[in-house]
Amino acid sequence: MAREPQRVKRRERKNISAGVAHVNASFNNTMITITDAQGNAISWSSAGMMGFKGSRKSTPYAAQVAAEDAGKKAAEHGVRTLEVEVKGPGSGRESALRALQAVGFHITSIRDVTPIPHNGVRPSKRRRV
């Protein structure tokens, strides 16, 4: 009556040489997603995933650790060159970029894709402290 041990399907190694690193640096966290040219995710990581909680998630060091983690996972799939797209005003922008270089990727281009409104929505009322 004992059940057979379940076979765990091993994740197949994608053999991709070039990818795009999307660095989303908000005021509270930094998220790094490495995709192929079509936008299919290869690896991802964030400061919160790496064990940083609260205000420590928004530090440059947390962004560096998250970028190293995402980079190592992507390198296992054969990624060697990266285009980097940086979005957001956070403090982890530059440190995440340096960490991706330190992992050993050849960075071909760096683009800032931060969305800038053409005077979007009305701001909330002024704070009175």
From Swiss-Prot:
Entry superkingdom: Bacteria
Pfam entry (one): Ribosomal_S11
Keyword terms of this UniProt record: Ribonucleoprotein, Ribosomal protein, RNA-binding, rRNA-binding
One GO BP: translation
MF (Gene Ontology): rRNA binding; structural constituent of ribosome
GO cellular component: ribonucleoprotein complex; ribosome
Subunit-structure text: Part of the 30S ribosomal subunit. Interacts with proteins S7 and S18. Binds to IF-3.
NCBIfam families per UniProt: PRK05309.1, uS11_bact
Cited function: Located on the platform of the 30S subunit, it bridges several disparate RNA helices of the 16S rRNA. Forms part of the Shine-Dalgarno cleft in the 70S ribosome.
Family: Belongs to the universal ribosomal protein uS11 family.
Protein name, per record: Small ribosomal subunit protein uS11
Organism: Zymomonas mobilis subsp. mobilis (strain ATCC 31821 / ZM4 / CP4)
